[in-house]
Amino acid sequence: MSDIALTVSVLALVAVVGLWIGNIKVRGVGFGIGGVLFGGIIVGHFVDQAGVTLSGDMLHFIQEFGLILFVYTIGIQVGPGFFASLRVSGLRLNLFAVLIVIMGGLVTAILHKIFAIPLPVVLGIFSGAVTNTPALGAGQQILRDLGTPVDLVDQMGMSYAMAYPFGICGILLTMWLMRLIFRVNVEAEAQKHESSLANGHSLIQTMNIRVENPNLNNMAIQDVPILNSDKIICSRLKRDDTLMVPSPGTIIQAGDLLHLVGQSTDLHNAQLVIGKEVDTSLSTRGTDLRVERVVVTNEKVLGKRIRDLHFKERYDVVISRLNRAGVELVASSDASLQFGDILNLVGRPASIDAVANVVGNAQQKLQQVQMLPVFIGIGLGVLLGSIPLFVPGFPVALKLGLAGGPLIMALILGRIGSIGKLYWFMPPSANLALRELGIVLFLAVVGLKSGGDFVDTLTQGEGLSWIGYGIFITAIPLITIGLLARIFAKMNYLTLCGMLAGSMTDPPALAFANNLHATSGAAALSYATVYPLVMFLRIITPQLLAVIFWGMG
């Protein structure tokens, strides 16, 4: 059998064994995709014992390409929500998550200096303790750039494997500890979260208002400042028994009922100006109007602003809402359309069908992947990661590397959405498949390289010490910031659990947090809020630590 065929066969065996290990769960918690690392260690041990030689160049390529695929697809997935998560609404959650990352780095630095832990080993422990595989890849990349011998770089994977199990267990224990210390009633916390959402300013809501302000009588909608802003959409107007789709030039009369869409604060301000909120239904049922959701798939409208498409003037159709990457937005006239945007349309059936044809509404396109943008994005990401950043006092130039470059490029492209006929939208199923393939390839190679010496290191070497260091790196930041967030910020327990899981970019921990309450989405929401920024910081942190420690000698 050729070296290539043998290497591929062994990698396939690693994937099978590792995924089987990952599917083993104890009380609903397992290693998940991280099981591939341990599958690689097991197979690698026996490969080493048998004296089998695999293709080193091929393993290196597969490891790096797997990492690139993984971080790129993560960036495309979270890109649309990354910059939004940095805004005020998620500022507090991101602040606490960033503190966890910083404190983890500080604990790592202290352990490195006090116990003189070799740099590759301590970076591996850090990556495993925070259960972040891209951090492992980024650390190995910067160590190679610094000229670290290959056998020492491979120690990073071994120490990562030592610290990884408690990294997963530690966050679950922290959630349990917070619940015990503060005697949390999960049902009450879920109800508080739902109440806060209902009273919050971030959700898109609706309000029906009767026009009672005499100053607005016989005025056009476009002449009423509160209705002519991009903060509120007037999607329906009912006069007597007639329901219509209003245009900017529609004349308002006393007694008209307006159906407004916007954030709660803006709706309240509009109600103070216009008149009184009423419970009267403005449903399209039984009328010649209907409400329908269509998806943007036509390349010709990508990047165009809603106002430039003139849907109201041409088709008498109003866009009441815009859903982008799962986030409901007010369909302001300045909003540019991106591939995969979901538009909420109000109008007559024939008119809605006409608008649907303009924007595409081809559901099958959502299941197709444009491969050209994928490779353009990966290529640009690799180029970005290769740009040297010279910092005074450092022995080598700092680079984003093969982990940071594709991630940042994917975040940017995911946020842009499309350029001309090129769009970076990727169907969730395709994104997940590429992401899982990438991480399986990466972890399989890391495990294979670590397997030969793993048992000896654990039983005769410093393996137990590495596990102890990992416990400190995992537990100290989580417990400290968890207590601060609960005591001083009065953070909701379910939100706190999601934030802790997000700060470790740990899907098993998110699954555990979601299972705390069957119907509440609090944990998932906070996880998604902090995940993009934390993932970026987790990849950058080991590179910064490596360069700083290397410079300090």
UniProtKB/Swiss-Prot annotation:
| Domain RCK C-terminal, chain residue ranges per copy | 192-276, 279-361
| A Gene Ontology cellular-component term | plasma membrane
Q: Give the HAMAP family listed for this entry.
A: YidE (MF_01016)
What PROSITE patterns does the database record attribute to this sequence?
A: RCK_C
Gene name linked to the record: yidE
Q: Keyword Ligase: yes or no?
A: no
Its taxonomic placement starts with: Bacteria, Pseudomonadati, Pseudomonadota, Gammaproteobacteria, Enterobacterales
Compartment list: Cell membrane
Give the chief site where it resides: membrane
Molecular function in Gene Ontology: monoatomic cation transmembrane transporter activity
Family note: Belongs to the AAE transporter (TC 2.A.81) family. YidE subfamily.
Matching NCBIfam families: PRK03818.1 (NF003007), YidE_YbjL_dupl (TIGR01625)
Q: What is this protein called?
A: Putative transport protein YidE
Write down the membrane topology. Multi-pass membrane protein
Does the record's keyword annotation contain Flavoprotein?
no
Q: Name one GO biological process term.
A: potassium ion transport
What does the UniProt keyword field contain? Cell membrane, Membrane, Repeat, Transmembrane, Transmembrane helix, Transport
The residue ranges crossing the membrane are 4-24, 28-48, 65-85, 95-115, 158-178, 371-391, 393-413, 437-457, 464-484, 493-513, 533-553
